[in-house]
Amino acid sequence: MKLSLVAAVLLLLCAARAEEEDKKEDVGTVVGIDLGTTYSCVGVFKNGRVEIIANDQGNRITPSYVAFTPEGERLIGDAAKNQLTSNPENTVFDAKRLIGRTWNDPSVQQDIKFLPFKVVEKKTKPYIQVDIGGGQTKTFAPEEISAMVLTKMKETAEAYLGKKVTHAVVTVPAYFNDAQRQATKDAGTIAGLNVMRIINEPTAAAIAYGLDKREGEKNILVFDLGGGTFDVSLLTIDNGVFEVVATNGDTHLGGEDFDQRVMEHFIKLYKKKTGKDVRKDNRAVQKLRREVEKAKRALSSQHQARIEIESFYEGEDFSETLTRAKFEELNMDLFRSTMKPVQKVLEDSDLKKSDIDEIVLVGGSTRIPKIQQLVKEFFNGKEPSRGINPDEAVAYGAAVQAGVLSGDQDTGDLVLLDVCPLTLGIETVGGVMTKLIPRNTVVPTKKSQISSTASDNQPTVTIKVYEGERPLTKDNHLLGTFDLTGIPPAPRGVPQIEVTFEIDVNGILRVTAEDKGTGNKNKITITNDQNRLTPEEIERMVNDAEKFAEEDKRLKERIDTRNELESYAYSLKNQIGDKEKLGGKLSSEDKETMEKAVEEKIEWLESHQDADIEDFKAKKKELEEIVQPIISKLYGSAGPPPTGEEDTSERDEL
C-alpha cells in the first residue's frame, strides 16, 4: 500500500509540476479562501510563508454578510454585519446553509424559519429576496450572495498584493455533496475567480498543521466546528503526503446553533416575565442575536456574561445574565453529538483512540471550554494541539495549496489526497449494486469494469449510476442514468461493455460506457443538475448498511447503552453517598430527589435487562434531566463537576 501510494504521489507530483509549468504564467498569484458560513478568511503564500490578509477594517476574518441599504448601497463584510439590527430584512447571511440545496430540503425549511430575510422558491431552489433600495425588490441565488463575499475576499487580497487576482483555492466542508461543491465553484466564477481546486476544510487545516511536521507517519484527527458546519476528518501525513482516510460530520451544526438555543431560552424567559412575544419584532430578535454571540464569546474566558440591550422591545430594556453553566446546559446535547462523528471516523479508519498522534481543533466554536473538555476526555486526557489560530487554520492551508498551484517552490513536496464519502457503482442484473469505487477511496481516481448484455441480441444497455453502501440498488441513491445504444446483435454475455468511473480533484464524477467491439461510447457527468444526497441521507445509508450487514453490532450497541446507563446510575449513587463529593454539598431535598431517581433507574435496569437501545437512552436522558439542573444550581457559574457522566457516556469500546 505504502509503495503504491508513494508511486502514485510521485506520478501526481510529476504530472502536477508539468501541468503547472504550462499554467504558471496565466494564473498569477493564487489565493486561498476559506468561505465560511459566518466568517471568511483569505491567505496567500508569499516569500516562503503564508500571509493571512486583513480587510479594510483591519480584521483578519470578514463576516460572510451582504446588505442592501434603503439608499440602494450594497455593503459586504463588517459594514453589512454592523447594520444588521437596523436593517434585518435586507441583510443576508448564512448563504452557505442554502447553497447547492433544493427548496424541499428539510434543513432549508428549518433554516428559513429563523432567517430575518425572505427566502422564496424559484426553479425548485431557495432564492433570497431583498429590497435593493428605491422600492425595488430583487431575488438572488445563494451562489450570488456567496460570490459577493468571494469578491470582497478577492478585493482584500488585491489591495494587499497590489495586483489583480484571478485564481483561487476555495474550501468547503468535507461532507459537502457534489451539488454543494459545484455551486461553490459557480460562486467563484460569478466573482470572477477561476476556482482551481475545491478542497475540504479539515484537509486544509491539516496542511496548515503539517507544514512544519513532516517526519515519519502521523495520524491526525481534525475536529472542525465553525459557525455553521461541523467536520471530523482523519488524515495520515507521511513525509509531506497527506491522505484523508475518513471523514464524517454534520453540515448543519455550529456556533449559530448554539446562539439559537440561547436566544430561544431568553425569548421564552422574556415572554414568561412580561407576557410579550419578541419574535414579532425582527429587529429585536437580531439585536438579541448580536448580544448573545458576544456573550458566548465572553464565556470562553469567563464564567458569566451580562446581556444588556437598550430599548429592546416596545421601548423596554433587556438585562439578563448568562452563565457558562447555563450556556452548556442549553447546548449539552449538541456538544455531546459532536463525539459521534469522531467515533465513526475512528471506526471507518480501523484505528483506536490511542493511535491518534495529534488532535487539531479548528473553527471558532472549538474555543468553547466544554467542547475542548469533551474532546480531551474522549481521547483519555490527550491534549489537543493549540499551535494554530482556529479561525485562520483553514485559510492558511488553502493558501499553502494555492502556493503549490502557483508553482511556488517553497511549499516543497506537499501532496494532498482526498477521498469520496460514499461507495459508487452501477446496477447489474437483479438490481445488484456492483461497486466500482468504494467509499473513502482517494481521489482523483479512475476505475473500469467490463460488463455485458443480459439477453441475446440486446441492442441497448442502460447504465444506472448509484451511490450508497447497501448490496441492492433499490436501497441506494440513483445519481443518473444513460443508455449505450447500437450494440451489434450477439448472444448474451458476448459484447464487452467497459464502464469507467472517474472522479476529478474536485470530487466531480464522470461515468463512461464503451462498447469494446465497435468503439461506440456514451457518458454522463454527475453535477448539481441531479440532486445529490444530503449529509443526513449519507449518514443514514452508511448506518443502514452497517445495520443490515451485522445484526450483532446492534446487539453490542444495546449492551453498551445498557452499560452506560448502569455505570452512570452507580457512579451517581456512589457520589451521593460520598460526603467528600456530591453527598456533602446537596440540600436534603435535592439529595432525596436524586437518590429516588437513581434507585428507580437501578430497579428498572434489574427488571429490564433486555430492553431496547432507545429505552436505555431514554432512561439515561430522564435521569440526566433530573440530575443536571440540580448540579447546575449547586455549582452556579462555576460549571458542574464531573458527575460520572463524562466518565461513562463516552466510554466506547473500540
Curated annotation (Swiss-Prot):
The modification N6-acetyllysine is found at residues 125, 213, 271, 326, 353. In unstressed cells, AMPylation at Thr-518 by FICD inactivates the chaperome activity: AMPylated form is locked in a relatively inert state and only weakly stimulated by J domain-containing proteins. In response to endoplasmic reticulum stress, de-AMPylation by the same protein, FICD, restores the chaperone activity. The modification Omega-N-methylarginine is found at residue 492. One of its GO terms (molecular function) is ATP hydrolysis activity. Keywords: Acetylation, ATP-binding, Chaperone, Cytoplasm, Endoplasmic reticulum, Hydrolase, Isopeptide bond, Methylation, Nitration, Nucleotide-binding, Phosphoprotein, Signal, Ubl conjugation. Residues 1-80 are annotated as: Required for interaction with ELAPOR1. ATP binds at residues 36-39, 96, 227-229, 293-300, 364-367. The modification O-AMP-threonine is found at residue 518. It is found in: Endoplasmic reticulum lumen; Melanosome; Cytoplasm; Cell surface. The modification Phosphoserine is found at residues 86, 649. The chaperone activity is regulated by ATP-induced allosteric coupling of the nucleotide-binding (NBD) and substrate-binding (SBD) domains. In the ADP-bound and nucleotide-free (apo) states, the two domains have little interaction. In contrast, in the ATP-bound state the two domains are tightly coupled, which results in drastically accelerated kinetics in both binding and release of polypeptide substrates. J domain-containing co-chaperones (DNAJB9/ERdj4 or DNAJC10/ERdj5) stimulate the ATPase activity and are required for efficient substrate recognition by HSPA5/BiP. There is a cross-link at residue 353 (Glycyl lysine isopeptide (Lys-Gly) (interchain with G-Cter in SUMO1)). GO terms for biological process: maintenance of protein localization in endoplasmic reticulum; negative regulation of IRE1-mediated unfolded protein response; negative regulation of protein-containing complex assembly; positive regulation of cell migration; post-translational protein targeting to membrane, translocation. Residues 420-500 are annotated as: Substrate-binding (SBD). This is Endoplasmic reticulum chaperone BiP.
